[in-house]
């Protein structure tokens, strides 16, 4: 018996492949099953051009057998088998792929696809086995051969008698160590789990002898273990079925089988693309926010399959962050994988798929908004924040795609509205899209700054989430209409009463300068208000940072004490202003007291903390005394 050396190359190369290429030892079973599937595919291809070969799919299968006594695990198939030369070529040369060569010769025949593209998957068996024995008989050959190896020291090939065509790979599992237990790969439940996880959609039956507990014949309460051969895999993936054949409950069952969520899917998206890149996908929008969605433990990503074989449980590159809530899977024949079939060799195809998926999700959400408004609003309550982050992130690169999906509460409609609906109702003389920010709709409605805009009959959008104003600042405008906060210095309109107010402000310049001095460092300016009607005072902001944005930024762990440029506005038509004027002429100490009170009052209205609550309390007591 002649021992032969591996053609490519040494113990170090094999050790690198076994120890470095694969991240999880369980992958070996996926690789051996994929190779077995390829072997059956090759008979199918041969039958296409050879009338003497009849391909009846029911005759072909893969069998996985565990023997605890011998500590062996066997994967056998009824595929095409290998000749002695093919054993030498495919198994005697590390990183030589018979499947890849076969695929190249038989490109795109009748939709069947060879899974294995590298000659490395077989060698993953050495991650769990001390010895690997391959017995095989090729189609059309009279005798079979046995290939055997214990690793990098080489291999032997012997002729053997074998009746049936096909290949059997028997692994002699390693002994357990302190760090690793190889017994798990002899356990029925573990093998079943691995097959379902990675190879559930292999197109041929994967069979196993399964132990069942049954009532012993002739008894009423005595049970016995019965061995029954079962097909473990589903074989036909739902995503390759015609959409017209599937019902909503089929998608819901798939959602639960894959454990994408414990809730019901709000929407499913079934995609089949055959263009620049070919892929199938089934995506789900969950009904509820996952419990860990806003934690660092949450991982975005879709399951990624290559020809029905799972290669990545969560591929993050398939989804943009703002669609991270989407669950589901993608299967493609066009992926360029690395030799371990666990990672992508380069990402051109993946980028094309990801771009297409992003566009499909956006399109389906727009359709949902148009045709099923109630369901869309349910979705928006859960994931609207993510869409706003999408508008704001990446310097607004995605704002054009997402702006028509945004909803905000309307002051006039008393419900959520789109930006398009708002603009369609704008009055002819209305210069801006107005918005107000606050912690709740009820608080916003009471803001002094909303009075003038509301009295003009203009609709106001209410922003109650911390990301709202950041997203709108990034949008800047919608359909050539700029966004304008009701707290901004210029509201875009001025009536006669406001012009008179401006004149009054000029007359009282000395008073406002004095108040500004008292509030030195706290406000940029004190001025007469053009927006207040019934309220005596309010705070507004100038510049890019609004008061609401200041609150958000200051709440962040790494805040840099960002502050809005605040302006204290005084209603010169209010009785309080008359008191201020009179005090300025007779008792400036009272002006100081009133100024501080008005400033703190304005802070409270905005939901900002009073800087010195004790001093504020004392000032109130002074007024009451």
UniProtKB/Swiss-Prot annotation:
Location within or outside the cell: Cytoplasm
NCBIfam families in alphabetical order: PRK05218.1
Location of the region described as B in the Swiss-Prot/TrEMBL record: 342-551
Pfam families, per database record: HATPase_c_3, HSP90
Region called C, residue ranges: 552-625
Binding partners and assembly: Homodimer.
Alphabetized UniProt keyword annotations: ATP-binding, Chaperone, Cytoplasm, Nucleotide-binding, Stress response
Superkingdom as given in the UniProt entry: Bacteria
Function: Molecular chaperone. Has ATPase activity.
Segments for region (A): 1-341
The species this protein was found in: Halalkalibacterium halodurans (strain ATCC BAA-125 / DSM 18197 / FERM 7344 / JCM 9153 / C-125)
TM stretches of this protein: none
Keyword RNA-binding belongs to the record: no
SMART domains found in the cross-reference section: HATPase_c
GO molecular function, one term: unfolded protein binding
InterPro entries membership: HATPase_C_sf (IPR036890), Heat_shock_protein_90_CS (IPR019805), HSP90_C (IPR037196), Hsp90_fam (IPR001404), Hsp90_N (IPR020575), Ribosomal_Su5_D2-typ_SF (IPR020568)
GO CC, alphabetical: cytoplasm
Sequence similarity: Belongs to the heat shock protein 90 family.
Protein name: Chaperone protein HtpG
């Amino acid at each position: 018996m002649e021992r032969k050396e591996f053609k490519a190359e040494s113990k170090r190369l094999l050790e690198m492949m076994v120890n470095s290429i694969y991240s999880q030892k369980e992958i070996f079973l996926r690789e051996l099953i994929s190779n077995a599937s390829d072997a059956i595919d090759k008979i199918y291809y041969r039958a296409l051009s050879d009338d003497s070969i009849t391909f009846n799919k029911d005759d072909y299968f893969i069998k996985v057998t565990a023997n605890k006594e011998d500590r062996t695990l066997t994967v056998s198939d009824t595929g095409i088998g290998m000749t002695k030369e093919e054993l030498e070529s495919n198994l005697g040369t590390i990183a030589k792929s018979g499947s890849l060569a076969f695929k190249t010769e038989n490109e795109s025949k009748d939709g069947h696809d060879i899974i294995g593209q590298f000659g490395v998957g077989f060698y993953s068996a050495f991650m769990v086995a001390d010895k690997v024995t391959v017995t095989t008989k090729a189609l059309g050959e009279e005798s079979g051969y046995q290939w055997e190896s214990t690793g990098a020291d080489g291999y032997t090939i012997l002729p053997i008698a074998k009746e049936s065509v096909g290949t059997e790979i028997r692994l002699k599992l390693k002994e357990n160590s302190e760090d690793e237990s190889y017994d798990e790969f002899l356990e029925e439940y573990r093998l079943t789990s691995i097959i379902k996880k990675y190879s559930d959609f292999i197109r041929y039956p994967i069979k196993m002898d399964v132990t069942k507990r049954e009532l012993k014949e002739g008894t009423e309460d005595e049970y016995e273990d019965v061995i029954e051969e079962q097909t473990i895999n589903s074989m036909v993936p739902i995503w390759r079925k015609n959409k017209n054949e599937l019902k909503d409950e089929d998608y819901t069952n798939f959602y639960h089988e894959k454990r994408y969520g414990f809730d019901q899917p709000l929407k499913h998206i079934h995609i089949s693309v055959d263009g620049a890149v070919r892929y199938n996908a089934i995506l789900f929008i969950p009904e509820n926010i996952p419990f860990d969605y806003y934690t660092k433990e949450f991982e975005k990503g879709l399951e990624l399959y290559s020809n029905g074989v799972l290669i990545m449980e969560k591929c993050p590159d398939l989804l943009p962050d703002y669609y991270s809530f989407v669950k589901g899977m993608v299967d493609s024949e066009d992926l360029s994988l690395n030799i371990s079939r666990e990672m992508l060799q380069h990402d051109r195809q993946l980028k094309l798929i990801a771009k297409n998926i992003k566009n499909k999700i956006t399109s389906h959400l727009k359709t949902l908004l148009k045709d099923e408004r109630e369901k869309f609003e349910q979705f928006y309550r859960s994931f609207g924040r993510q869409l706003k982050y999408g508008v704001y992130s990446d310097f607004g690169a995605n704002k054009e795609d997402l702006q028509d999906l945004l909803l905000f509460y309307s002051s006039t409609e008393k419900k959520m509205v789109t930006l398009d609906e708002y603009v369609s109702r704008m009055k002819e003389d209305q210069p801006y899209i107005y918005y107000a920010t606050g912690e709740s709709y009820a608080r916003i409605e009471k803001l002094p700054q909303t009075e003038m805009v509301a009295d003009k009959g203009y609709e106001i959008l209410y922003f109650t989430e911390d990301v709202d104003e950041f997203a709108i600042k990034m949008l800047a405008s919608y359909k050539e209409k700029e966004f304008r906060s009701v707290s901004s210095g210029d509201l875009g309109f001025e009536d006669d009463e406001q012009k008179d107010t401006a004149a009054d402000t000029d007359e009282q310049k000395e008073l406002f300068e004095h108040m500004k001095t008292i509030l030195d460092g706290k406000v940029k300016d004190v001025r007469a208000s053009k927006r207040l009607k019934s309220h005596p005072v309010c705070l507004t902001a100038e510049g890019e940072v609004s008061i609401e944005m200041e609150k958000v930024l200051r709440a962040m762990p790494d805040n840099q004490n960002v502050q809005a440029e605040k302006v204290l506005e005084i209603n010169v038509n209010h009785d309080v202003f008359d008191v201020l004027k009179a005090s300025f002429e007779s008792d400036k100490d009272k002006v100081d007291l009133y100024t501080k009170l008005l400033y703190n009052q304005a802070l409270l209205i905005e939901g900002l903390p009073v800087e010195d609550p004790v001093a504020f309390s004392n000032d109130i007591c002074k007024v009451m005394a």
